[in-house]
Curated annotation (Swiss-Prot):
PANTHER family xref list: MSF1/PX19 RELATED
Occurrences of domain PRELI/MSF1 (ranges): 1-175
Annotated InterPro entries: PRELI/MSF1_dom, Slowmo/Ups
Alphabetical list of PROSITE patterns matching this protein: PRELI_MSF1
Superkingdom of this protein's organism: Eukaryota
Parts of the chain that traverse the membrane: none
Name assigned to this protein: PRELI domain-containing protein 2
């Protein structure tokens, strides 16, 4: 089965400011679930200017305690891998992330893009699609997917609120035209 979450947001800030804010977003006291984010690889293609980054995020295990009675869910934290491709020239950044924990039982993938808005070149559009599919937990599959869907939606909205707050703090009021 699986569940999908789609998010679309326009930040009324220029692309470069939004991307810089995204890359510095975590850890953040507004989201205690993200413990750390570490860049493990970064390289620039000199011919195209494309910047590739691979980061590993360590997050708290947010699975409810009652479900952690199942041994496979009883882990202290969850690791996510994020890869991004930033083109300052084209003013877009593509991001792919997936869960490194529970890979034999679950698949969690997100694909995101930050790009210059077609509405206004001083704004930035954010589009994200996330999909979670649980396969190895028997009768718990449906329960875990429902929980994951709710958590993903809330997490996406929280991430947008954090971005808006950080952008306002670091760059001032949004560019309204």
């Amino acid at each position: 089965m699986g569940v999908t979450v789609d998010v679309h947001q326009v930040f009324q800030y220029p692309f470069e400011q939004v991307v810089a804010c995204f890359l510095r977003k975590y850890p953040n006291p507004m989201d205690k679930n993200v413990i750390s984010v570490k860049t493990v690889e970064e390289k620039k293609d000199e011919s195209t200017g494309l910047i590739y980054r691979k980061r590993i995020a360590i997050c708290q295990n947010v699975v409810p305690e009652i479900l952690r009675k199942v041994s496979i869910l009883k882990v202290p934290d969850i690791q996510l891998e994020e890869e991004s491709w930033l083109s300052l020239q084209k003013r877009n950044m593509a991001i792919r992330s997936h869960c490194l924990t529970w890979t034999q039982y679950a698949s969690m993938r997100e694909e995101s893009v930050f790009r210059e808005s077609v509405e206004n070149p001083n704004w930035t559009e954010f589009i994200q699609t996330g999909r979670i599919s649980i396969t190895g937990a028997g009768f718990l599959n449906c329960i875990l997917e429902t929980f994951a869907s709710t958590f993903l939606r809330q997490g996406a909205q929280k991430g947008i609120r954090i971005m808006e707050m950080l952008l306002k703090e670091q760059c001032g009021s949004p560019l309204v035209e």
